[in-house]
Amino acid sequence: MAPRAIRLGVLTPSSNTSLEPLTQAMIASLPNVTVHFSRFPVTKISLDDDALQQFHNDKILAAAQLLADAGVDIIGWSGTSSGWLGFEADETLCAAITEATGIPATTSVLALNKACQEFGVKKLGFVTPYMDNVQEAITKTYATIGIDATKERHLRMSKNTTFADIDEPTLDEMVADVVARKAPAISTFCTNLRAAQRVTYWEKEHGVPVFDTVSTVVWDMLRYCQVDMSPLKDWGVLFTK
């Protein structure tokens, strides 16, 4: 019998329409890896109480348990909420997932932070769709780990479904603007942006690493599972580390 494929479990915001096709496209070049998704309710991104309550762990843990039913090898939260909630939110979530399921867990943001360590990044430019106060919270959160996140562009949007409608020319202009402000590395920081497929173009165009948050969680899960990521080199320099 052939060895069982490595199974990645991905937690997905219910209104997200970008991360699943992008993640599937990445994994398509890895013949012994499959990816499986589980959703929980998220419809808007803001600092309002009802929006923050979407990220309470009980709903996320219920979605994680469904992934555990599939016998996945690792669970990744493909979302950026700890950027404004604080990194401890993701750390607590990962511990709770492992305690409930026995399966290791990671997140887009914790993986991004690992990537910054790997690449020696102390100044990180941000491209996001978020509201002013959400972006300000992200900047403050990154300051807690010594990363300057003040070079940024954001679009002052809050409805999650609309993030997927942001087109490549808009993202191209935003990335170019943040690079022009002397950001030595960039993060497209929202997993409902259709951005991961554009990373290699931006890296070649601007000569800086670009860490997309759909990509970071995939990278960290594959690292944990000791998967050869060389087939993913066309998704960005991240996958060469």
Model-predicted regions and their roles:
Residues M1-A62, D132-D167:
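N-terminal glycine-rich anion-binding loop in soluble enzyme alpha/beta folds
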Residues L93, I97-S158, F239:
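Conserved beta-alpha
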